[in-house]
Amino acid sequence: GVSCGAATAASRDSQVAYKAAKVGGTEAMAIGSNWNFAPIVDLLYNWRNTIVQTRSFCADVDRTIEYAKAFIKGTEECDMATTIKHFPGDGTEENDQHLMMGINDMDCDTWMETFGKVYSELIDAGVKTIMAGHIAQPAWQRKIAGKDLDDHEILPATLCPELITGLLKEKLG
């Protein structure tokens, strides 16, 4: 990428996200790529999370949406598809989801006001794809399952029909 999310957000100017995406998209198209696995729309709620620390835009929901929309616009103007990630949201704890399952332990209401708002608004704006993370969201899995699951029954979004079908596809659209 041309710039990381944190550096982009530090500019306090969503046009930086747009311009970085245009440069990256132009370069990627020149070598035959038509799909960008970005932007990262995780929220940095735990500074110890080394995966999200510099890759996310920030902890602010509305600013994250603003920068992501600008990034998506810049990328798609280069005829590239974009991917928002890592559903259901990284950045709340310290686990590296590439090594072990991350756990987004927010309750359903808090999740909807934060990560849910980010995903919902970007889906409504027409983002092309969403990447699931190896991250569990126990509150939503239990709510959609309609029962109190034991901890060993909690699955990451990559393997969880309640999160992918129930939450992402049916509730968020």
Predicted region positions:
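Surface-exposed, active-site-proximal loop segments in enzymatic domains
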Residues: 1-9, 46-57, 96-102
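Glycine-rich, aromatic-flanked loop segments that form ligand/cofactor-binding clefts
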Residues: 1, 20-45, 64-91
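Glycine-rich anion/phosphate-binding loops
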Residues: 10-26, 61-66, 109-113
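Extended aliphatic helical segments
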Residues: 2, 16, 23, 41, ...
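Second-shell residues forming the walls of enzyme active-site clefts
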Residues: 59-173
